[in-house]
Swiss-Prot record:
This is Ribonuclease HII. The lineage of its organism: Bacteria, Pseudomonadati, Pseudomonadota, Gammaproteobacteria, Chromatiales. One of its GO terms (cellular component) is cytoplasm. It comes from Halorhodospira halophila (strain DSM 244 / SL1). Its main location: cytoplasm. HAMAP family: RNase_HII_B (MF_00052_B). Keywords: Cytoplasm, Endonuclease, Hydrolase, Manganese, Metal-binding, Nuclease. GO terms for molecular function: manganese ion binding; RNA binding; RNA-DNA hybrid ribonuclease activity. Pfam families: RNase_HII. NCBIfam families: PRK00015.1-3. Manganese or magnesium. Binds 1 divalent metal ion per monomer in the absence of substrate. May bind a second metal ion after substrate binding. It is an enzyme of class 3 (hydrolase).
Length: 195
């Protein structure tokens, strides 16, 4: 038989956290047997709807995996390469338990070191159910991590803005300076460090 969508191993991959000034970049990889009702691009869902959808994905997906690149890796590699590393890690988790025929990656580029043929899908988080599912998992898992970082590093508001460059975050950086979770390679943080 020839591989096809669903249980035969078409993996959707997406990330969350490329743009924030703090925290990791998180990627998810998902194999679906069939589309799951209510699962669409994570940016189109409320936080509550994303959480419900994430629970459905975790229970109904044929396979799923998560990869991340932390702040140290982001600063050492750059955000593009760190994102690809997180994606490759997520796909590797899926590959441990599920055969992979093809990897569909949201965006214009694909990582080099994937265990199967891959292709980019521009706007894939709205077009491909497996990428939509990956988008939701990556976003909910990263958001949960940022809430924990808010407790570990109070005063920055990570639980509210999730590390993105809001006015609140800018004020906190100016008042407190960067914490270990800030991406020193990002211009707003680098400027505060005198770079």
């Amino acid at each position: 038989m020839t591989p096809s969508r669903g249980a035969w191993g078409v993996v959707g991959v997406d990330e969350a956290g490329r743009g924030p000034w703090a925290g990791p970049v998180v990627a998810a990889a998902v194999v679906l047997a069939e589309p799951i009702a209510g699962v669409t691009d994570s940016k189109r869902l409320s936080a509550r709807s994303r959480e419900r959808a994430a629970a459905l994905i975790r229970s109904e997906a044929v396979a799923w995996g998560v990869g991340r690149a932390d702040v140290t890796e982001i600063d050492a590699l750059n955000i593009r390469r760190a994102t690809f590393l997180a994606m490759a890690r997520a796909v590797a988790v899926v590959a441990e338990t599920s055969p992979i025929a093809e990897v569909l990656v949201d965006g214009r580029e694909i990582p080099d070191d994937l265990p199967a043929p891959a292709r980019p899908v521009v706007g894939g988080d709205a077009l491909e159910p497996a990428i939509s599912a990956a988008s939701i998992l990556a976003k909910t898992l990263r958001d949960a991590e940022m809430v924990l970082l808010d407790e570990a590093y109070p005063g920055y508001g990570f639980g509210r803005h999730k590390g993105y460059g809001t006015a609140e975050h800018r004020r906190a950086l100016e008042e407190l300076g960067p914490c270990p979770m800030h991406r020193r390679s990002f211009a707003p943080v680098r400027r505060l460090l005198g770079g």
